[in-house]
């Protein structure tokens, strides 16, 4: 987590961020992380009781975050799944920003910082053609795996890549 925070230091200064923690793992840390990045955080579904994980909350019920962001006039929102290995974002209008767009944003950012190892992002065969076109325009290479974060991770380890993920919101970073 510390590594990710160094990549995004001060990048959320004064940004109004909604967080849907799905009453799961993110409940313990998400607010602290975004606060440390300078965000003004607004949190929902962060009271796990052992039974309510993912219950009408988080990335599998994105409409909850969409409404929360719009009703509170927030700048952006992030919804995690119960074990916090998946993240879906919404913009200020509640429009979904899926894993492909998140990969694009981080891939571009890492390339601009000279930190995109092997100039490559790992995706799955389910990624959108628009993502590949955008990577081509930026001169970023990509490798496609079978669907499943397991396969993305295996490719990253085998080939030494820094970032990979799925359209579903599983995003994986390595040092």
What are these regions (language model features)?
Residues 80-91, 162-164:
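Active-site microenvironments of hydrolase-like enzyme catalytic domains
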Residues 1-70:
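Gly/Ser/Thr-enriched, mixed-charge loops and adjacent short helices
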Residues 1-2, 6, 93-165, 170-172:
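Proline/glycine-rich low-complexity loops and linkers
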Residues 4, 20, 62-65, 78, ...:
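Buried hydrophobic positions in well-ordered alpha/beta secondary-structure cores of metabolic enzymes
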